[in-house]
Structures are given as structure tokens and as C-alpha cells.
């Protein structure tokens, strides 16, 4: 993600593709999409809050859904291989 995109609060994705294999980025996208957000950028635009992350892995620890309930995630991988192809990767 480019720095200019992070500064633009109204950035819209230009394209979307599906993840082919698991990575740390795919893991975090999976967590955001489970909570009802496109990605970290959309979460920051809507909630305007810091994202809690696990210090050792860097994975998302806690997200607030749009209905104000919370999702708590484990320190370890949660996106199983059979779920990887469902994760959407957006390009800006």
C-alpha cells in the first residue's frame, strides 16, 4: 500500500483478486473480512481507532464490528488452507 493511499481517507480499490496462498498479509485480510471490512484501510476510515495486534506475530488481535461487538483472534494462524481462496486482496 502506498503512503499516498494511507493519507487519502476516501481511497477506493481499483481492482480485486483472490489470494492464492497463505501469507501474513492474507491472514490479516481474512480477519478484517470476517469482521465485515474490506481491509485495514476501510476499518481505519470507519472506526478511526488503533488496531490491536499481537506483538510477536503482528496479526490482528481484536476488531470491532459495525454493530459494535468485538471479534477476538488468536495469536496463531486462523485462516486455514481451505479458506485462503475466499480472501479478497484489493489493489489501490
UniProtKB/Swiss-Prot annotation:
Q: Which InterPro entries match?
A: Meiosis-expressed_gene_1
| Highest taxon of source | Eukaryota
Per the record, the GO terms for biological process are: cell differentiation; spermatogenesis
Tell me which GO cellular component terms the UniProt record holds: nucleus
Record keyword Calcium present = no
Alphabetic keyword roster: Differentiation, Spermatogenesis
Q: Does the keyword Transmembrane helix apply?
A: no
**Record's family?**
Belongs to the MEIG1 family.
Role: Essential for spermiogenesis.
PANTHER family cross-referenced by the UniProt entry: MEIOSIS EXPRESSED GENE 1 PROTEIN HOMOLOG, MEIOSIS-EXPRESSED GENE 1 PROTEIN
* Name recorded for this polypeptide: Meiosis expressed gene 1 protein homolog
The organism named in the record is Danio rerio (Zebrafish)
Amino acid at each position: 500500500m502506498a503512503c499516498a493511499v494511507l493519507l487519502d481517507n476516501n481511497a477506493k480499490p481499483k481492482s480485486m483478486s483472490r489470494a492464492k496462498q497463505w501469507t501474513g498479509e492474507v491472514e490479516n485480510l481474512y480477519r478484517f473480512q470476517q469482521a465485515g471490512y474490506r481491509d485495514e484501510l476501510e476499518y481505519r476510515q470507519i472506526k478511526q481507532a488503533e488496531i490491536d495486534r499481537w506483538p510477536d506475530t503482528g496479526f490482528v488481535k481484536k476488531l470491532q464490528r459495525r454493530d459494535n461487538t468485538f471479534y477476538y483472534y488468536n495469536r496463531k494462524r486462523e485462516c486455514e488452507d481451505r479458506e485462503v481462496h475466499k480472501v479478497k486482496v484489493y489493489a489501490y
